[in-house]
Amino acid sequence: MTAEYIRDWQQPRHAVGREGTGIPAPESALSSWLDAYRVENERRQEMADAAFSATPLGNLINKSLDAQEKQDKTITLAGDARKQARGAVDEAMASLRLLPSYLRDPLIRHLSFLRKKQEADRRKGKKSWQAERYARGTLRKIFERLDSTDGRWLTPGYRSLAGRERLDDLLYLPQLNKHQIQTLATMTAAMFSSTFEKLCDGFGATDGELTMDVTLKAYQMLARMALHLHAMPPHYDALTTDKDRRNEPDTELLPGAILRLTCAEWWKRKLWLLRCEWREEQLRAACLVSRKTSPYLSQDALSEFRAQREKTRDFLKSFMLENEDGFTIDLETVYYAGVSNPVHRKAEMMATMKGLELLAEARGDKAVFLTITCPSKYHATTENGHPNPKWNGATMRDSSDYLVNTFFAAVRKKLNRDGLRWYGIRTVEPHHDGTVHWHMMVFAHPEEIDTIVSHTRDIAIQEDRHELGNDITPRFKVEYVDGSKGTPTSYIATYIGKNLDSRAVDGIDPKTGKPRVDHETGKSMAESVERAIGWARLHRVRQFQFFGIPSRQVWRELRRLA
């Protein structure tokens, strides 16, 4: 119902300047001045930006901003693609395309395989959800694990230093190749060199003359920067100035430490090792290191190991050594004459082990074979290739540090406190997902060996004891050496051979009549040995360690003289 008005002036009117009336709002003098000021300010800003862009620094910053804008645009487009995805598989595909190629390609291949299999089953009238389950379950967990893994390296200090010094490639270090690492190392060394000069000037260096006090202070600042980049500074323990330090820092080491921190070759090695370790942990988090995919180490790392080994062989074959008398010999012959030759290294290990066996027989000691495994939280992947729900993001180095610094250190402390004597050898092996486990051959007095085994067992299962229940064999296994079955040397020989030289364990299995297969990987012994050696080289793991005996260096020197 419409209200009727007797007079026109009684009807409601719109406010002046409202939309739809066609009556513009009156423009004041102040608004005119503000508009003119804004236009003039924008003109001056454009002129200043154009002048700054013409400088080398401005050009470099603009290129960096353009790259960042391009990346942001890619992320936005990927986000739009996910919103428009028709299902979980399409959404997973859109997310996978954002990953680096070494992560993206194998995951996309597996997802595409599952989708084709699912579509084939559905055409046959079967209910199949393999691709959807993989996309909603496994891939979602993989994305979370990758974020957690990257967070271990992309710390606030790491990000801050990379952004402040314009070393943006540090944020994408796992994706770089050797040439790019070389360029980044040169830029990093130059940054440390210029920072050292600024620090010296700031600490009071006059006329280019440096005192030890000024140099030491500058080194401390550079060392903190290197630690932010996950690189251990040279001679850090000897040059630290902590309050708890009992003696003065060894200043004679300062020149060498500064030269290394400002050397491109030193940074090239450090950054390459960091890149390889970071990249391998990403692949472990993506379940690409397992019995189902690539046991012990990733296929990417295995290819790098094979290429480097071939490069080393070509280098050794290309050079010869000549002494002052004119005698020449191939460099390859000299290289493989020492313990670098796996055959010689195995012979030395077996000779030492046989010596321990003979010593134990003379002393009347008994031998026991132990297997120690890390808790479940250190294992990234289950045997069927699925993400381990108990994994806490621990790296391979974390599992090794647990066995060395937590388990073995606690056992030695306990045995020393109780006055118990043991000696033997420990061998380090990878599980299928790259996690470390130990095999130990222990010799001890017959009256003490049971106590030693008991202490070792209690410490091995102490952490996360609740996950074991009544069965402790997943964490700790013990087998007393039975003379009727073999000697201590024969017990450990297989584990020494399978981590050094496949010829020691290769051949035909007498039980099956077929080539021997490694039960841990399901592959031939030759390939398993190659993968174990590549795993140890990648993570810089000490595969064998004798304990409770004097150093073998004296024996090596006497053998060399003989």
Each language-model region and where it sits:
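Short hydrophobic/aromatic beta-strand micro-patches
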Residues: M441-H445
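Right-hand nucleic-acid polymerase module
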Residues: M1-G434, P446-A562
